Amino acid sequence: MKRILVSILLCLSLASPAVCGPRRAIILRAQFKDVKFEMDEAQAKALADSASAYFTEQLATTVTFDLGPVITLPQDMSYYGHNSTLRRDELIYKAVMETCLASVDAVDFARYDADADGVADNVLLLTAGVSEAEDAGDDAIWPQMNYLNEWSAAFALDGRKIDCFSVSTESAGLRTLCHEYAHSLGLMDLYDTDGSASGGLAPGLWGTLSLMDKGLRTGDGSLPPNFSAVELDVLGEGTCELAAPGLHRLEPMGSSRRYLKIPTDVDGEYFLIECRAARGWDADLGCSGLIIYHVDRSSNPTGYSNYYKKDLTAAERWYYNQVNCRPDAECVHVVAALPTATSAAEIPFPQPGINNLDAETNQAFRYRDGIPVPYVLTNISTKSDGSVSFEISEPLKLLEVDVFQDAAILNWEVAGAIGQDVECEVAWCRDIEKIHTSGKAKGHTYTIEGLTPGANYMAIVSATTKDGHSYSVRTDFTTRTYREGSRPYILIPASQRNADGSFKPWARLPLRVANAPDAVSVRWSDGTNEIKAGDDGHFILTGNCTLRAEITNKDGSRDVIIKEVTIR
């Protein structure tokens, strides 16, 4: 059945993001020679109206689902729903085409082209009977989104190309209908689409938090859950705010569509924070509170794909609709309040005795490479109106990283909330190395010596409190390269000088010499007295002086560099 799934996945990857502004969708109804609708007209209209209400709320724009006439197709259900070794529902495209052609007198397909590109946005086919996904047999219809072009069968009606289509069944309910239509907006499946392959069954979003997960299978199928921060982020919808230290309050997604994002240094990898309340469309959610997602749509490697027989990046998994196929490399997963959670009720914050989140107590609050998120969430509490309040702090913050050819100076601060009596350590390694070198820091500064020019490095600063609690922050940098044929010179940061070359008052100099690969020591003076860098690795200029660097090389020779310093 591999080829069947692959065909559907490739089609999903072609779907376009949602179009801003009002839009219409058409629900065409098809029954078969041997299977007729049990749903009456009033029930069908209620389904269309509910779909309209749902997407209008989720997209914050008017979405209207129109109802087409009931069309009786000339063949039995098995004719259209039969599976081959190459494709599921091998002739479903004929059901779509025949229903469209039979509905043309009652339906103006030109109304369903929101972006006026000459192509109908989607045709939603609602079929009679029970679906194959509900164990109705291999010849029953499988809910899906696909393209007629997959069969080279796209055609035109009312001046519009008919290509993209979704299929649901009368038994599947509103939730499945909305799920399949949402694929046409550009949303991917967030459950494990290859089942137990690729390393086992991944939890996805716990089968409840997302319309695109197995949330469509909870309750009686009548309540699709609200779009989560993940769906809104993918579609560019809702209000996304960057997380920052301070007090925060988030209202339930069903009423505000506002969420926070914690970015990372890796483009496409980030965390999303939202509030959910088990009411309205989320009544079947099974939980309420603060939900945190780790999203990866980057070029990070995510392991082997059993379907594509190759390693995939996170971005490729989104393209191929294999977002959460590997339990050890999910591209969207929930940072559960209880790391050992076995039910949706144990996912959100707060939980009894758990109203804080940091990377030490919850390993899921780390980037894919294992580096801790620098933020800590504390005092998480739910309010009577369903909202959640909490505080974000940054216990350990890098203030600056000065990079040279053979060294780097790191300066950081420790938040008063964790106390100043902490022990700090710095660990670093080149990008081609696996073993870290580390050193204890005196205070909140550290100079890494002996680095290779023109090399990429990663450094991690860790602060450990008296009670053993640890916080970390990471930085990546590239050391400066040597200038071939250039004499040694005093390295002076441009930020410390004025446009005319003079120095700013209280300028901070790192007292480093560049292009001196053979130097074994450097003695610094201000023309009168020997000077040394302070605790932060810098020397502060307090007045005009003659800056002098006396270099002793490996062969015993000496170089002297003099720089006249004028402060303005």
What spans do the regions from the language model cover?
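Extracellular fibronectin type III
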Residues: 467-481
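Solvent-exposed segments in extracellular or luminal domains encompassing
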Residues: 448, 537-545
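Non-catalytic C-terminal accessory/binding modules of secreted extracellular proteins
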Residues: 26-31, 36-65, 71, 135-171, ...
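Conserved aromatic anchor
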Residues: 408-419
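Active-site-proximal segments of metallohydrolase catalytic domains
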Residues: 56-157
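Extracellular low-complexity, O-glycosylation-prone stalks/linkers
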Residues: 417-437
